[in-house]
Amino acid sequence: MIQVIQLKGKDKHLYQLLAPLVMDPDVIRANNNYPFKTSEDFVWYIAIDNRDVIGFIPVEQKSGKKAVINNYYVAAVDEKRKEILSLLLSSVVTAFIPAGWTLNSVTLIQDKEIFEKFEFVSMDKKWTRYVKMYR
């Protein structure tokens, strides 16, 4: 059974859970060779299945109740990817939207439909691999 946990950006447990993934060359390559970052302004949503991290969404909290989803990762494809990403997004939306936050996301084009199911809308900004969305 997949469990989603929430950790603050400087939580020691976050580093223990994510280090094997964020230092893996395949995972870094999947992130367009961009390093994963965190700070005290981040909240991380981590999907765990049988003690294995199978995905995560970092959310950076900015001023004015604006939050940004960027550099998320899901270790699956097709239907399993949709399932994991949906669980993660559900946790993020449940935590932020009722509290009055605006969510912006730099979304992989392949995941656009999943974000739309959670009422994210595309903005005019679009790159080769990503689309900017908000809710």
Residue ranges of predicted features:
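Conserved beta-strand in the GNAT
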Residues: 46, 51-61, 68
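Conserved GNAT acetyl-CoA-binding A-motif
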Residues: 95-108
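Short amphipathic alpha-helix that is part of the acyltransferase structural core
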Residues: 1-31
